[in-house]
């Protein structure tokens, strides 16, 4: 199963770390997007996942999506995807 995260901040990082540590999903099966380059680089370094700046790429490649953006960005993000 390919898992996609829109947003790779603290909430997403905790979820990713837990599922990878438990062996539920391998890092290679996770893709995450973040508008901030620093966020993408941190997720790639800490979790070994594929990262992108493109939310649409995540929606196209993932079977399951996790929306992990701040509440004030929900409407904008949902409209985009």
Where in the sequence are the language-model features?
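NAD(P)+-binding Rossmann beta1-loop-alpha1 motif at the extreme N-terminus of oxidoreductases
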Residues: 1-46, 50-53, 57
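Rossmann-fold NAD(P) dinucleotide-binding segment
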Residues: 50-81
């Amino acid at each position: 199963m390919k898992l996609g995260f829109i947003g790779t901040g603290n909430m997403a990082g905790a979820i990713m770390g837990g599922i990878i540590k438990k062996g539920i999903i391998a890092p290679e099966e996770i893709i995450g997007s973040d508008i901030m380059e620093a966020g993408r680089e941190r997720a790639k370094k800490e979790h070994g996942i594929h990262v992108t700046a493109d939310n649409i790429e995540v929606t196209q490649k993932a079977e399951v999506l996790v929306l992990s953006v701040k509440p004030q960005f929900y409407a904008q993000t949902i409209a985009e995807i």
